[in-house]
Amino acid sequence: MQYLVDTNIISEIMKKEPDEHVWKWFSGLEVVYFSAVTVEEIYFGLSRRNLVRKLSWFQQFSEDKAVILEVNERISRWSGEKRGALSAAGKSVTMADSLIAATAHEHGLILATRNTKDFENFGIALQNPFLK
């Protein structure tokens, strides 16, 4: 199985003492896929707190070990359609989460996230590495 790793999983891995279940799961991945949206979210979070070492680690990790999936027209279209339908049904979803869900859908990946509730209405496969 292949996974699109959500921002909160990358954030957990960068902690001094990450959750043991997440670490074990993450260490077993042959390929680490994440969305370009995750890159933006990580850079934003680390830059805002001026965490230079973690930013350097993430940059190196991204270049050496990860496959970053770009947002293209198909992903944008699917995201907009799903987010629009969810909004019309009274369900609020962020653009970032919608684009991440669309990226998982487009590439046929399971979305690994702690926040499964945020993605449950997209009809994509989900896994929470924080659970056993």
Q: What are the language-model segments listed below?
A:
Residues 2-3, 20-106, 110, 120-124, ...:
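PIN-domain endoribonuclease scaffold, especially VapC-family toxins
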Residues 114:
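Conserved acidic donor-binding loop of glycosyltransferase catalytic domains
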